[in-house]
From Swiss-Prot:
Glycosylation sites: 51
Signal peptide positions (record): 1-23
Organism, as annotated: Ixodes ricinus (Common tick)
Keywords on record: Disulfide bond, Glycoprotein, Secreted, Signal
Record bears the keyword Signal: yes
Protein name, UniProt field: Evasin P1095
Disulfide bonds: 48-66, 52-68, 62-79
Annotated compartments: Secreted
Gene Ontology terms: cellular component: extracellular region
Amino acid sequence: MELNAFTILQIAVFIAVGYHANTHSPVAGSEVQKLTSDPNDDIDVSYCGMNCTVVNGKSDECSENCKCLHEGDDPKGICVAITYFGDWGDPNDDPKINEATPQTQIFEKKRK
């Protein structure tokens, strides 16, 4: 089997890229820099499964935990639930974090 220079070059580049990816990827247990977050940025918005219409600045079609979200002057919108996570703090700082981890096996193994 005959190898030409281009094939050898491709193999060398493949090995170099693989080596670079393995030596420069994050490793379990490595220190990751924590970014400071603004509580106003830590939010979760989820669709409530309903549409709504704003009439005279009010909407009664959304459920209790949802709000009507519309664009500009368009009276038609969607119901969304907004959760602010910023006030909850870092869960890893909670002294009871170890109690929150599963202590028993969650999934049962198939029996033969």
